Amino acid sequence: MVSSNGSQCPYDDSFKYTLYGCMFSMVFVLGLISNCVAIYIFICALKVRNETTTYMINLAMSDLLFVFTLPFRIFYFATRNWPFGDLLCKISVMLFYTNMYGSILFLTCISVDRFLAIVYPFKSKTLRTKRNAKIVCIAVWFTVMGGSAPAVFFQSTHSQGNNTSEACFENFPAATWKTYLSRIVIFIEIVGFFIPLILNVTCSSMVLRTLNKPVTLSRSKMNKTKVLKMIFVHLVIFCFCFVPYNINLILYSLMRTQTFVNCSVVAAVRTMYPITLCIAVSNCCFDPIVYYFTSDTIQNSIKMKNWSVRRSDSRFSEVQGTENFIQHNLQTLKNKIFDNESAI
């Protein structure tokens, strides 16, 4: 499908339908399984929950809500027709932005919580409570839903292909970008990306500096290694999933408002947009890795389950070995009796 950005740069972006269909199918399977397992562990397996667990539960719920909309998107990208109505189109768009920026903010909450626990372990006791964590989570949900509301307002289904099919998730008109969306993108990028990015990098740097102080050298190397792994995994997932898309979104907004009209740059930005969006969506699959490295209780639960499985397997092997030993002795005894009878 050849489209235009409102300037003299026609561009064929039809490759995005195949890319979205394949990537969203994979994210649906992996994201559904991993986040369902995570929520089961959080709710059913963990006996003790703290404020970090509260953030992770909300992050998993945000991922699942978006994952549940993926089958509708997959159908649309496969058939290029949206038969599910305007309301479901708006809900799907809202949950996309809610998930992306909700994930960014909840990951930032986890990073700040870790910073307070390690850098100010005693002073932060009154702040790091489950009640305060719940209040923060409610504030995050209101923020991301409020931020995604304008996109929902402007997004709607429309006829395409001589009125033979309905379209959803397609781009907004150039006039809408110039009047409203460019300002909304600026707000979203500042509140939902740049401030959280600065907080994540700053908190991680402060934690690393605290761990390297002579006062903390007495701490076990194992605990320091755990924290270092935690910070590394957290930052890698955050930067890998969200930095490319949000940087490209800024360039895309500039392109749609015709701030620059160089056709080579326009083609590069439009090509990278669906690719970076797919990378951002993959955060649903990577968030459970954050849960594992962040929570000792989750690691212990998984290790306990593996230990119980191995223990049951070893018990089964012992029982089976004992039965084989008894059967072997009985067979030997029978053979001896038979030999004695034959000798008589």
UniProtKB/Swiss-Prot annotation:
Ubiquitously expressed. Detected in the hair follicles and skin (at protein level). InterPro entries: GPCR_Rhodpsn, GPCR_Rhodpsn_7TM. Belongs to the G-protein coupled receptor 1 family. The keyword Transmembrane helix applies. GO terms for molecular function: G protein-coupled receptor activity. A lipid is attached at residue 284 (S-palmitoyl cysteine). Keywords: Cell membrane, Disulfide bond, G-protein coupled receptor, Glycoprotein, Lipoprotein, Membrane, Palmitate, Receptor, Transducer, Transmembrane, Transmembrane helix. SUPFAM superfamilies: Family A G protein-coupled receptor-like. It is a multi-pass membrane protein. CDD domains: 7tmA_LPAR6_P2Y5. One of its GO terms (cellular component) is intracellular membrane-bounded organelle. GO terms for biological process: blastocyst hatching. This is Lysophosphatidic acid receptor 6. Disulfide bonds join 89-168. It is found in: Cell membrane. Pfam families: 7tm_1 (PF00001). Residues 47-56, 112-134, 205-230, 294-344 are cytoplasmic. Residues 1-25, 78-90, 156-183, 252-272 are extracellular. The keyword tRNA-binding does not apply. Binds to oleoyl-L-alpha-lysophosphatidic acid (LPA). Intracellular cAMP is involved in the receptor activation. Important for the maintenance of hair growth and texture.
